[in-house]
Design a protein with these regions (language model features):
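HotDog/MaoC-like acyl-thioester-processing domains
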Residues: 70-128
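Hot-dog-fold acyl-thioester-processing enzymes
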Residues: 1-65, 128
Length: 128
């Protein structure tokens, strides 16, 4: 997670919180002593890492939502990885698609859990 990643994201999304934007504030008020990443950025990067695996390439139809918990801060300089597990799948009324539930675990370079999520997606099915 680079400073550029954080600054670009907070400017793009309008995250005006001094914790993300103002290094003088960070130096004075943050318990971390360096810039923290918004949880939304951590989630977005995790989704990008998953997309890069090709796991759902060409099959994704819709992101249906889910639940996310921020467990620990992600700070400038951290390196992230994602573990993904299919925890449920079900057919829909339409034979060309199904609903898949994934559990995501985002870990930093010290293998500390920083974010966990349970996500549902509509996925294209192979037809017989």
């Amino acid at each position: 997670m680079s400073e550029t990643d954080i600054v670009t994201f907070v400017n793009l999304c309008g995250f005006t919180e001094p914790l993300f934007m103002d290094m003088e504030h960070v130096k004075k008020a943050s318990v971390f002593g360096r810039r923290a990443a918004p949880g939304a950025l951590t989630f977005a990067l995790a989704e990008g890492l998953i997309m890069q695996t090709g796991l759902i390439h060409g099959t994704g139809m819709a992101y249906l939502g889910g639940e996310m918990r921020i467990i620990a801060p992600v700070l400038e300089g951290d390196t992230l990885r994602v573990e993904v597990e299919v925890v449920d799948k079900r057919e829909t009324k339409k034979p060309d698609r199904g609903i898949v539930t994934y559990a995501h675990r985002v870990l930093n370079q010290r293998d500390e859990l920083v974010l966990e999520a349970r996500i549902q997606r509509m996925i294209r099915r192979k037809t017989a």
